[in-house]
Regions:
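Conserved ATP-dependent motor core of P-loop NTPases, especially the RecA-like helicase ATPase domain
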Residues: 5, 9-11, 49, 66-259, ...
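Nuclease catalytic cores
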Residues: 55, 59, 461, 692, ...
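Flexible, glycine/threonine-enriched loop-and-boundary segments that flank and lead into catalytic domains
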Residues: 355-380, 392-407, 675-699, 908-948
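Conserved ATP-driven helicase/translocase motor core recognized via long
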Residues: 19, 44, 177-345, 716, ...
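Accessory C-terminal helicase-associated subdomains
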Residues: 322-326, 340-344, 501, 526-532, ...
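Accessory N-terminal region flanking or inserted into the helicase ATPase core
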Residues: 1-17, 27, 44-46, 123-131, ...
Length: 1014
């Protein structure tokens, strides 16, 4: 075992394989602190991870360590020893880091890529509009709009409707039961990324002999009849086999291509026949009660029948693949024309641009020019959670990292990850990149494993080691995995081995689902969860299980939080009642909403406050809302009855009232908009102590809980072959035929084998992640095997059953380590307090009046704009937006009056000097929005061009505000009277942002090609 205390954290190129709980965030923080302490500038360090939460934790870790070291000599000495530093002034290091935080590249890979594309959008070919990143609900809404447009009547006008529907019918061949929109959404979700990254990939596996699909219907009856006619020559070994064989032949005869009938056959003999034909052996030995051989005319006819059906199924899959490509291509063309060409890009588009250099020489040269400019600003790379890195991520990063890692020791690479926690393969994570780094890209990189746990006590690790270290059982159940599972036993850090830190682990049997939930409640009650100062996580595989278990625990008195996020409008009864109140206010004719209100406790309060007549009630309440906003009137309705609600219900009501107060601040008084506001509301939450957090295992990654319960260990075989949707070869991609057909296609069979090996590895990693969340208590519930249970099935449940069992196992408890009363070592919480009242909300903030800087111009001189003049002005602004620094690149201008005017501006020596960088450190912004509070009003405007001059330390010393004016004035100086108010408003705003800088407003007269300084 490698001792992490021996790791030289400042080794130039270092790969740390950090097991769960071993302190990877700690090592990342030490690396950054060491680099800065050695004199490296924080802004030349890039640290990338996969979630904003992880990035925030990393930043907190760095600042907390530095603050402790700066204030405590003992902490300073310990940090120096761990990092390998000479005596260090951590006050200075802390100050350096804090000053550099705005320029410190700490965040997600996605945000880093977006930052690069935003900085070099024109170099990346985004010229149709300003780069705008689509993410979250906005991205989903736009995708839905495009999907709707694909199947809308607008396609008729484009002449695409018949083409699209034809492709779609082929894509859904044999699967017509799905709705059009549902099927299309599934295709897009499954295939769009494949399409964008498949420029040189064949759609459909090679070497497949296509047949006419009609051949099956033409020949199946002849072949089936021949098979039945020859049955008498078969030597049966059981009298029941004759009828069974006839039934199977009829079942095969009744099969329809694409229907999936044979895949779902309940007849064991039919399955036997399909498997026997797939082996391509000379004789067909099958089993029905006993083994017997299908030979003679019957055997030949059955073999020919099954092989013909398989060929037709393969052809159908190939045609579906081609049709899917056509459907996704139409969708992608709409994305290109409606989004990407206009600068609207999602994270996947950004990754595509960052990895485009691999596709052709022109793209490589373009990326090389961009990297040359970026490379000088980055010396040190830190990559976190490397097992979750996708090939798309790596392709985008590698050109930059390659420069740093192959340079001298002044430039470094630090990678940390854990192969055993690779649970995001389904979204592209490629654990094989570890091998690619060590074997191909950086064969000289130092590798250091970490197995000591700073999270889990010895009793928890005993169970983890027993299960995850049992590679013999793993291999016998699961066979080969990709990659292979590597294990070394974990040990607890010394401070966790003291008697006061000990814990307990147990694996026990449950009889059924009802018993599972009741036993879970009993375990949490036995441990006094909610009464002692400890955290508890209940981890499951699916969102449906999260909901089921949360509701059951809540009904049994536990304070429960799901998934770390809450939806207060829909996940509780008070929230539903409040939402329906808003629905009724939005539409008083909504009978359902009113019915919910009449059955809820809100009805009596509404009558007391606003009268018994519902029409008068609606008018009274909407009148109050028009005066006070939504939060105050609704708080008056809720508060009188909230005292009778659970703590959970009161929290949810407070969430909604706070959200409505935020909505009131927008100035909107529409009940419909208010309803949509709270229905979309999701609030991040921290469970704290005394709360039970129920979440999926994926969501739990990176977290730790004093108590972990795993009540739903899957007993299904791994993998579930019905989830094999895309077959991939080195140079091809295909939709998948039914499972029985795949055995008859070597290419697809091999592709499925690779997929299955990866699925098995990910399932093993999933269980490892779940087990290693536990600090002090780990409780696993397993279904008790029945008489017909296949205990050799490749399931996670069987793995635990085989590995955890020992000589002390009983009928109730399979494994146990430690003392069940360990929780008494944890202090109790304070006695329960009285129910907390609804929080008092501040008065809603009135929406500020909005003004624009252009309203500040002198109205007596305001020109009257003609449509042609406005069009000319818009064209000039659009062309000038494309102008970067003319000493770096010359803009390509079209032939137009506006282009001639822009060319004239660039030719002017005084204006040209303003548009040149001349090697200075200047940040350039075009069409920059500017918002500020001026005299109590919200000022909002767009600055045509903004220059921020920085000194050698990065401080802004001069700000140039540049506005282009196309007014037909007699003299350029006539613009001063017209626009001095507007420019002074901009100047005042920028002066507040940069108080120590010189702020210079500049007008450019397009008509006279002159500069005017104000």
């Amino acid at each position: 075992m490698h001792d992490e205390e021996q790791i030289k954290i400042l080794e130039p190129n270092l790969l740390i394989l950090a097991s769960a709980g071993s302190g990877k965030t700690y090592q990342l923080g030490n690396r950054v602190i060491g680099l800065v302490a050695k004199g490296n500038k924080p802004e030349k360090i890039v640290a990338l991870t996969f979630t904003r939460k992880a990035a925030g934790e990393f930043a907190d870790s760095v600042l907390t360590k530095l603050a402790k070291a700066a204030s405590d000599p003992h902490e300073a000495a310990d940090l120096e020893q761990r990092i390998g530093l000479e005596p260090t002034n951590f006050d200075t290091v802390l100050a350096t880091v804090v000053r550099s935080l705005p320029r410190f590249n700490l965040g997600t890979i996605d945000s880093f890529f977006a930052k690069i594309v935003r900085s070099f959008q024109y170099e990346f070919g985004i010229t149709g509009g300003k780069f705008d990143l689509l993410e979250g609900p906005r991205a989903s809404a736009i995708a839905d709009e495009i999907l709707a447009s694909v199947i809308s009547s607008r396609l008729d006008a484009e002449g695409r409707d018949s083409k699209f529907l034809h492709a779609f019918r082929r894509a859904t061949m044999g699967r017509e039961s799905q709705s059009v929109l549902k099927a299309l959404s599934k295709f897009i979700e499954t295939w769009h990324e494949q399409y964008r990254n498949a420029d040189d990939v064949q759609w459909g596996p090679p070497g497949i002999a296509h047949v006419n699909l009609d051949e099956w219907e033409k020949q199946k009856h002849t072949l089936a009849n021949a098979a039945i006619d020859g049955i008498r020559s078969i030597i049966f070994t059981d009298k029941r086999q004759t009828d069974a064989l006839q039934d199977s032949i009829e079942e095969i005869r009744n099969h329809t291509i694409g229907s999936g009938n044979l895949s779902n056959s309940s007849k064991s003999l039919t399955k036997n026949i399909l498997e026997a034909v797939a082996t391509q052996s000379n004789t067909l030995v099958v089993k029905s009660y006993k083994d017997f051989t299908l030979d003679g005319t019957t055997g030949d006819a059955i073999r020919e029948m099954v092989e013909l059906a398989a060929q037709c199924e393969l052809t159908a899959a190939f045609r579906r693949t081609a049709a899917i490509r056509d459907v996704v291509r139409i969708y992608d063309e709409l994305c290109e024309s409606q989004l990407r060409k206009k600068g609207l890009l999602g994270f996947s588009d950004v990754k595509y641009l960052m990895g485009e250099w691999k596709k052709n020489e022109a793209a490589r040269l373009k990326r090389e020019a961009i990297d040359f400019r970026i490379d000088a600003s980055i010396d040190h790379w830190l990559l976190d959670e490397f097992q979750d890195t996708s090939n798309a991520d790596w392709n985008g990063l590698w050109p930059l990292i390659n420069e740093a890692a192959s340079d001298d020791a002044s430039r470094t690479l630090f990678v940390v990850g854990d192969r055993k926690q690779a649970i995001y393969g389904w979204r592209g994570g490629d654990v094989g990149l570890f091998k690619k780094i060590t074997d191909e890209h950086l064969p000289g990189i130092t590798t250091a494993p970490m197995y000591r746990s700073y999270r889990s006590c010895p009793e928890v690790l005993e169970l983890i080691n027993k299960i995850c270290g049992d590679t013999a059982t793993m291999h016998s159940l699961f066979g080969e995995t990709s990659p292979s599972w590597e294990w070394e036993n974990h040990v607890s850090a010394p401070h966790l081995q003291s008697e006061t830190k000990r814990g307990h682990s147990r694996v026990e049997w449950i009889e059924n689902d009802e018993g599972r939930l009741d036993r879970l409640v009993a375990i949490l009650n036995e441990l006094e969860v909610g009464k002692r100062n400890m955290t508890c996580g209940v981890l499951v595989r699916s969102n449906e299980q999260v909901t089921e278990i949360s509701e059951h625990l809540r009904a049994n008195g536990f304070d429960v939080i799901e998934e770390g996020r809450r939806k207060p409008a829909t996940d509780n009864q008070p929230g539903i009642a409040i939402t329906q109140l808003l629905e009724w206010l939005a539409n008083p004719a909504d009978r359902f909403a009113r019915g919910v209100l009449e059955m809820s406790p809100l009805a009596d309060i509404l009558r007391n406050l606003h009268g018994n007549d519902w029409n008068a009630m609606w008018e009274s309440l909407t009148r109050e809302i028009s005066i006070h906003g939504f939060s105050t009137p609704l708080a008056a309705v809720i508060t009188p009855i909230a005292v009778d609600w659970s703590e959970f219900g009161r929290r949810r009501a407070n969430d909604l009232l706070a959200a409505l107060a935020d909505f009131d601040a927008t100035g909107c008084k529409s009940p419909r908009d208010a309803t949509e506001w709270i229905e979309r509301l999701e609030i991040a939450q921290s469970p704290g102590v005394a709360a039970v957090q129920v979440m999926t295992i994926h969501k739990s990654k990176g977290l730790g809980f004093d108590v972990v319960a795993l009540p739903n260990i899957p007993d299904k075989a791994v993998p579930q072959t019905q989830h094999f949707e895309i077959a991939r070869g080195e140079q091809w991609i295909s939709d998948t035929p039914p499972a029985w057909v795949r055995r008859m296609s070597p290419e697809i069979d091999e592709a499925e084998s690779r997929w299955a090996a990866a699925q098995r590895y990910e399932a093993i990693c999933m269980l490892y992640v779940a087990l290693t969340r536990a600090k002090r208590g780990l409780y696993v519930l397993l279904d008790r095997p029945g008489k017909n249970t296949d205990v050799e099935k490749a399931s996670l449940s069987n793995w635990i059953q085989h590995s955890a069992k020992n000589s002390e196992s009983t009928d109730e408890i399979l494994f146990e380590s430690g003392k069940s009363n360990w929780f008494t070592l944890i202090e109790p919480l304070e006695a329960a307090k009285l129910p907390s009242p609804l929080g008092k909300l501040q008065n809603p903030v009135r929406k500020r009046a909005t003004v624009t800087p252009s309203q500040s111009k002198n109205k007596t001189h305001a020109p009257t704009h003609s449509p042609s003049g406005m069009k000319f002005g818009s064209e000039v602004h659009a062309l000038m937006e494309q102008v970067t620094w003319i000493d770096d690149s010359t803009p390509a201008l079209p032939k137009s009056d506006a282009a001639d005017a822009v060319a004239k501006l660039i030719a002017s020596p005084t204006i040209a000097s303003l548009l040149k960088r001349n090697g200075k450190s200047i940040d350039l912004f075009r069409e920059q929005s500017a918002d500020a509070i001026v005299d109590g009003q919200l000022m909002t405007g767009i600055i045509d061009r903004l220059h921020l001059h920085r000194d050698s330390s990065g401080i802004v010393t001069r700000v140039e505000i540049i506005d282009y004016k196309t007014d037909a004035v007699a003299s350029a100086h006539d613009l001063v009277d017209r626009y001095s108010g507007q420019m002074q408003a901009y100047q005042s705003t920028l002066q507040k942002i940069h108080p120590n800088a010189e702020v210079v407003p500049i007008l450019i007269s397009v008509k006279h090609a002159e500069l005017v300084y104000l």
